[in-house]
Amino acid sequence: MNIQALLSEKVRQAMIAAGAPADCEPQVRQSAKVQFGDYQANGMMAVAKKLGMAPRQLAEQVLTHLDLNGIASKVEIAGPGFINIFLDPAFLAEHVQQALASDRLGVATPEKQTIVVDYSAPNVAKEMHVGHLRSTIIGDAAVRTLEFLGHKVIRANHVGDWGTQFGMLIAWLEKQQQENAGEMELADLEGFYRDAKKHYDEDEEFAERARNYVVKLQSGDEYFREMWRKLVDITMTQNQITYDRLNVTLTRDDVMGESLYNPMLPGIVADLKAKGLAVESEGATVVFLDEFKNKEGEPMGVIIQKKDGGYLYTTTDIACAKYRYETLHAERVLYYIDSRQHQHLMQAWAIVRKAGYVPESVPLEHHMFGMMLGKDGKPFKTRAGGTVKLADLLDEALERARRLVAEKNPDMSADELEKLANAVGIGAVKYADLSKNRTTDYIFDWDNMLAFEGNTAPYMQYAYTRVLSVFRKAEIDEEQLAAAPVIIREDREAQLAARLLQFEETLTVVAREGTPHVMCAYLYDLAGLFSGFYEHCPILSAENEEVRNSRLKLAQLTAKTLKLGLDTLGIETVERM
């Protein structure tokens, strides 16, 4: 149920009947304050200006044509021409009933699209670090939301599995295997990469061998391809452990590494030359873009092939966008890549559009995000100033959550405690990130994220168990409850019901903008409204069975909405805390 869409259409029709143009925007929004109703139509100002009349005069004319019979109990004009809409309690009650009768809580499915989501993208032969966290979990929340809405989502894990460093890594892997009688367990990927680099820098003979190996790998030699595959396998096996711990839906099947696009690169360079987009400049192949200017104010040159014949990230990104449209049949492509890559992506996409590889009708969207900072406001590092490994961060989250839940549940069994600590610890790390607007940097703070008050995972998980506990105490007959009507008489009942029915609107925003913090804010608000409702509208001690059952149904829809909302974020719920 999308009340905003329903009201927008009704107000738009009334505006047209009052003389507004057919493309007028009613600007129906959820009201910020209760006294302004549940929704507000703010579009009169802009349209009245075009029509040369006072906004309030237009609003009055719109009201004469606005039929919200059975939807609103009151409609009024406020200020210079805002239209405040108060939803009818009977309308709310009917739609709460419908939401409870549906597995999807009444959420409609929009027209199905094929959407490619590019996220996570770790590098081969390196351990995942905190810099990969935001892309991985924000991207996964977007994927879960889009899939719930019925879209065909293709996860694209753009792994860094190609480049000149692979000569050095294969040479080092070969040396290790010889010394360890062919047995090789790469437990410490970070150390492996560091040692390979040290040898490369200090041992000229080793460096020469590494350079030869790059050439052999790139020419398709089977032995070197096999060694390369081994490095990819070891890395992705380790990464999968991290994905599973994070409750992220990526699997090995979603890997679409840089190497996938290698065969396309020569053809793309040749095609861009043939189309007159790419030219030779100082031995390199360059595309000059008028949209981007260099320091001298001239069109910026974007290199797509170096003097030595090597390709660049831009070339791969051009091939990648082309592949996603032509081979994967994407109708929309979302990239969860940090904001520092913005210009690079815009340049690649400008070339993609000029070359006609992806039509303008297919959006390429950079859903960028800021950095994760320490309490000092600087990039999050270890005490020694090194990069924080993601596995270490999750270990610490688990350890802190164990202490926290053991303190609150001294009698809980070890198994239960471990499950609860896992849900709370991992949930806390994810929710702390997801609840912030992705476009900004955020401060990583253990105390805040593990707090049981405020907009945190522990608070949301606790809020969910609190609603469930009402049902345990009620000892209700599910069938009897399903048949009971919902009656809304109190203001707090109406406020809770209206917010519950805004779940679909929230999902729509997350799907459109790729902003999971909007879902977090909605769920936090919902938990707060339930708290006020629970305090002021007795459930188990209600004045009669009819009111008791109706309030139980509001509590039931609250629990289902909290659970489903947290699920779209990839946050686990628990039955007891």
Swiss-Prot record:
Membrane keyword on record: no
GO biological process: arginyl-tRNA aminoacylation
Position of sequence motif 'HIGH' region: 122-132
Highest rank taxon of the organism: Bacteria
GO cellular component, one term: cytoplasm
Enzyme class: ligase
Locations listed in the record: Cytoplasm
HAMAP family documented for this protein: Arg_tRNA_synth
UniProt subunit comment: Monomer.
Family classification: Belongs to the class-I aminoacyl-tRNA synthetase family.
Name the record gives this protein: Arginine--tRNA ligase
Source species of the chain: Shigella dysenteriae serotype 1 (strain Sd197)
